[in-house]
Amino acid sequence: MSKYIGPDCRLCRREGMKLFLKGDRCYTEKCAFAKRPYPPGQHGQERKKLSEYGMQLREKQKVKRIYGVLETQFRRYFEMAEKMKGIAGENLLSLLERRLDNVVYRLGFASSRGEARVLVSHAHFKVNGKTVNIPSYLVDVGDVIEVKEKSKSKPRFIEIKEKYAKRPSPKWLEKDAENLVGKVIALPTREDIDMPIKEHLIVELYSK
């Protein structure tokens, strides 16, 4: 599947929920989903009843879009999840949460996962003292994530510190908002993921 390059707000409308892809805009009256909470297109308001396969596919697409992952990589995460101890669906979500771009977002060091992905790619972050510019890098317990010292003085990071860094982070992360430093103190569990995701549908889809 190729990368989607259209408006992010159309994806929220397609999935029938806010995916929080646009940062601040998602919390304002400008949010397209808040104005039109139905799929885009001429017949968008005429929601059709999905088949079992349709519901499974829709759930997979939703999760891929939340985390900004394409099909090949998403399938690879699922294969990893199946080999891990525990429940495959919950393992899958835990792996996605451990992506560096997601962790940066969860720490409040970016307004959205999309911005976090860009900032990581532009080498603004260190993990355990070393620069990491791979958004899909999987963090582990004990890892320390920080904004590079020379990046902290950039206007965008000054704004991030003022607007986002002090927002609450999940319990598996701890942070020093003043210095833009975070640490992984546990692996994320299903209870830590507050989004309405039906991961069992994804497991059923890939198990066919």
From Swiss-Prot:
| One GO location term (cellular component) | small ribosomal subunit
Q: What is any Pfam family matched here?
A: Ribosomal_S4
Where in the numbering of this chain does the S4 RNA-binding domain appear?
98-163
Q: Which GO terms describe its molecular function?
A: rRNA binding; structural constituent of ribosome
GO biological process terms, alphabetically, are: ribosomal small subunit biogenesis; translation
| PROSITE patterns named in the record | RIBOSOMAL_S4, S4
Query: Keywords in UniProt for this one?
Result: Ribonucleoprotein, Ribosomal protein, RNA-binding, rRNA-binding
Lineage, top-rank taxon, reads Bacteria
Q: Which family, according to UniProt?
A: Belongs to the universal ribosomal protein uS4 family.
Q: How does it assemble?
A: Part of the 30S ribosomal subunit. Contacts protein S5. The interaction surface between S4 and S5 is involved in control of translational fidelity.
- State its role: One of the primary rRNA binding proteins, it binds directly to 16S rRNA where it nucleates assembly of the body of the 30S subunit. With S5 and S12 plays an important role in translational accuracy.
Task: Report what the protein is called.
Answer: Small ribosomal subunit protein uS4
Native organism is Caldicellulosiruptor saccharolyticus (strain ATCC 43494 / DSM 8903 / Tp8T 6331)
